């Protein structure tokens, strides 16, 4: 078990462990894509070690990170303590039992970096913790959407990062629970490359009209380096 500390672009410390998925590009980019309003109550759904919750952190937000597994959640709690964050809470629970965890309509914004891959797709991750984070064996995309919709009030928003080849799976699941896509942005490794990541922000309730497809984000562009806080 090798632990390390990552300094995030916003200056916060993230404790990591080789047993669990470490900070990746997708969480960093989603944290920049998500636009919670001022003083919002925000839920990181399936937060793991808390990377996304810490990346999106602002002093005005009230953040809850929900995680099923003991190990990642313990690291998240250590990161909260190391950063002395009074507006961040780590909550253990199964998102499939959301009705027993958080009140209906209690959140303004949900963020989620979910398992990308179908449980039957490709090789398994090397540890049970990484399999849970990588593949939808513990919860499905549909169950994630149901959980997000339950905790959001009407007009609340949720932001997801996903694989483009499974985008329809996500959009279909969202539509079933009144989560209407309002912003979509694709991430490309180069100008010539097909997208490798897609980010979707949806709103609970309202018209299906008004979807905005934002300009693509190119890896290692000036904007990309700004997100990482790197002078280029």
Language-model regions: role of each:
Residues 1-36:
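Class I SAM-dependent transferase core
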Residues 15, 89-91, 182-185:
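General small-molecule cofactor/ligand-binding pocket signal
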Residues 19, 138-195:
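Conserved Class I SAM-dependent methyltransferase catalytic core
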Residues 21-23, 46-49, 192-193:
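Short glycine/threonine-rich catalytic loop with a Thr-x-Gly-x-Asp
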Residues 32-123, 146:
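Conserved SAM/SAH cofactor-binding pocket of Class I
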Residues 114-143:
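Mobile active-site "lid"/loop adjacent to the S-adenosyl-L-methionine
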Residues 192-232:
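SAM/dcSAM-binding transferase cores
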């Amino acid at each position: 078990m090798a632990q390390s500390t990552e300094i995030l672009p916003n200056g916060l410390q993230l404790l990591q462990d080789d047993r669990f998925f470490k900070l990746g590009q997708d969480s960093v980019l989603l944290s920049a894509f998500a636009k919670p309003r001022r003083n919002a109550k925000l839920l990181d759904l399936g937060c793991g070690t808390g990377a996304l919750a810490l990346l999106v952190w602002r002093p005005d937000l009230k953040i809850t990170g929900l995680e099923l597994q003991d190990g990642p959640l313990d690291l998240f709690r250590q990161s909260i303590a190391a950063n002395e964050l009074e507006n961040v809470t780590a909550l253990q629970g199964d998102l499939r039992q959301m009705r027993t965890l958080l009140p209906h309509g209690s959140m303004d914004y949900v963020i989620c970096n979910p398992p990308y891959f179908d449980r039957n797709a490709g090789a398994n991750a090397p540890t049970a913790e990484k399999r849970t984070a990588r593949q939808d064996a513990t919860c499905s995309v549909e169950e994630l959407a149901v959980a997000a919709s339950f905790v959001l009030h009407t007009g609340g928003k949720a932001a997801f990062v996903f694989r483009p080849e499974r985008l329809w799976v996500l959009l279909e699941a969202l539509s079933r629970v009144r989560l209407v896509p309002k912003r979509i942005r694709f991430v490309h490794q180069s100008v010539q490359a097909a997208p490798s990541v897609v980010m979707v922000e949806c709103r609970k309730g309202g018209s299906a009209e008004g979807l905005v497809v934002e300009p693509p984000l190119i890896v290692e562009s000036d904007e990309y380096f700004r997100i990482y806080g790197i002078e280029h």
